């Protein structure tokens, strides 16, 4: 009794997750998304004025050096040879050096623009990862519901077969049914029981897949979801989806950004044909210590500066080759963008057609299920009266189960089309607001 109370209490306290809660948990914990966010942070860190070359560089340096020498000098007047051994001189330097590029053919400003574009590309890549994860979690969430409903249908099939087996067994014992009827009912019951057990495995596999997307530590734990049916949106409009896709599709936005990056790469090559102006300045102190001679030490403190002006005159035509290749890359980026637009339009047309077709199939299967249930009820009444054979009863049962399965499949397929339409149009994050 105590065990039952504890189990009941644990079941009552089990967390029930809505789709939005699953999405929020996945967006917070998914490892692939965390990696992409780290990559975005790298591109954010790189998009700085200093990395582009707008800011000067300053170095603080210090140096110590010494020399030990033995000298031998022959005097011109007296022909005397003077030897000095162990002459030890020392030099100490310390200073600050400043370098600044004043002009480099617009290379610095173009580099900064490229870094900002790369930063935006990193944000787009993160958005793509988020949209893929939202679509993946949503699809698996409803697949889990699909597997739960299918398990319920199989359980219902087992109950029907069990009831049929009970009726046949009773009538077989009193001689109303043959042994063949009894054996067939038993085979059908075992077949439905086997299908039920296999469906339990499919449900567990879906739970594992959903837990993996949510980055949960324990993957093999069933998850309780709030929804018990698959509701589909039937109000989507093609014109709105097309317009939204052309404006918001992340893959298309990424292709457009690639075109801008290709143009900036070309400008960087062109900038190398301009002259450059660089400024350098320094301020430091130097101390020399002498072991011999009239001076014991000498120190100097001061500044130095300079301006360097230069220009690339000839580099073996490599720069010209690189500019030509950069132009080709611009054309390729434009073609890839156009190809991406065509591919997305084609995908949208195909998914839309599948979506509309599945909506019609869904309505049809709802009607079929009503008819199949009515047929089963009539068949069951005739079977109980002995006017229907076991095989005919089994066919009525299979007709009902098949109708339930077709309706379930149509519902899930329509939901997948809905998810794909929202994703391709850049609106899949709307599931976060449900």
At which residue positions do the language-model features occur?
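N-terminal signal peptide c-region/cleavage motif recognized by signal peptidases
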Residues: 7-9
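Bacterial Sec-pathway N-terminal export signals of envelope proteins
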Residues: 12-63, 69, 217-260, 341, ...
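Small/polar, glycine/serine/threonine/aspartate-rich low-complexity segments that form flexible
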Residues: 13-14, 61-100, 226-235, 267, ...
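Periplasmic alpha-helical coiled-coil/stalk elements that build and connect Gram-negative outer-membrane
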Residues: 17, 21, 45, 132-244, ...
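Sec/SRP-type N-terminal targeting helices
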Residues: 34-38, 51-52, 88, 102-130, ...
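A short glycine-centered flexible hinge/capping loop motif at secondary-structure junctions
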Residues: 172-176, 383-387, 424
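Short terminal targeting/anchoring segments
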Residues: 180, 387-409
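Acidic, low-complexity, intrinsically disordered peripheral segments
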Residues: 406-434
């Amino acid at each position: 009794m105590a065990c039952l109370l504890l189990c009941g209490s644990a079941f009552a306290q089990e967390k029930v997750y809505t789709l939005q809660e699953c999405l929020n948990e996945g967006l917070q914990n998914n490892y692939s998304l965390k990696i992409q966010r780290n990559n975005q942070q790298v591109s954010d860190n790189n998009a700085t004025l200093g990395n582009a070359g707008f800011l000067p560089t300053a170095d603080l340096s210090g140096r110590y050096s010494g020399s030990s020498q033995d000298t031998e000098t022959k005097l011109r007047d007296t022909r005397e040879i003077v030897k000095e051994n162990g002459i030890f001189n020392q030099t100490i330097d310390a200073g600050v050096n400043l370098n600044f590029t004043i002009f480099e053919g617009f290379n610095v400003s173009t580099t900064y623009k490229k870094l900002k574009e790369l930063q935006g590309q990193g944000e787009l890549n993160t958005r793509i990862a988020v949209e893929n994860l939202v679509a993946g979690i949503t699809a698996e969430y409803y697949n889990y519901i699909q597997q739960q409903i299918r398990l319920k249908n199989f359980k219902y099939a087992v109950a029907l077969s069990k009831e049929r087996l009970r009726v046949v067994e009773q009538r077989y014992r009193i001689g109303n049914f043959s042994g063949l009827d009894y054996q067939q009912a038993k085979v059908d019951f075992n077949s439905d029981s086997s299908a039920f057990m296999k469906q339990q495995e499919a449900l567990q596999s879906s739970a594992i897949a959903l837990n993996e997307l949510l980055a949960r530590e324990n993957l093999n734990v069933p998850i309780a979801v709030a929804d018990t049916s698959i509701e589909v949106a039937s109000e989507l409009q093609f014109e709105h989806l097309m317009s939204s896709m052309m404006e918001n599709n992340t893959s298309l936005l990424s292709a457009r950004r690639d075109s801008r990056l290709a143009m900036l790469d070309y400008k960087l090559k062109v900038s190398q044909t301009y002259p450059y102006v660089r400024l350098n300045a320094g301020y430091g102190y130097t101390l020399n210590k002498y072991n011999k001679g009239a001076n014991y030490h000498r120190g100097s403190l001061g500044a130095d500066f300079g301006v360097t002006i230069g220009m690339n005159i000839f580099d073996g035509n490599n720069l010209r080759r690189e500019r030509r290749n950069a132009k080709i890359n611009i054309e390729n980026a434009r073609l890839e963008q156009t190809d991406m637009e065509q591919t997305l339009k084609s995908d949208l047309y195909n998914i839309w057609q599948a979506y509309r077709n599945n909506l019609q199939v869904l309505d049809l299967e709802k009607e079929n299920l009503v008819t199949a249930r009515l047929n089963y009820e009539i068949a069951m009444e005739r079977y109980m009266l002995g006017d229907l054979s076991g095989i005919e009863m089994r066919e009525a049962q299979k007709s009902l189960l098949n109708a339930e399965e077709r309706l379930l499949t149509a519902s899930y397929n329509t939901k997948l089309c809905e998810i794909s339409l929202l994703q391709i149009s850049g609106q899949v994050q709307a599931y976060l607001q449900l």
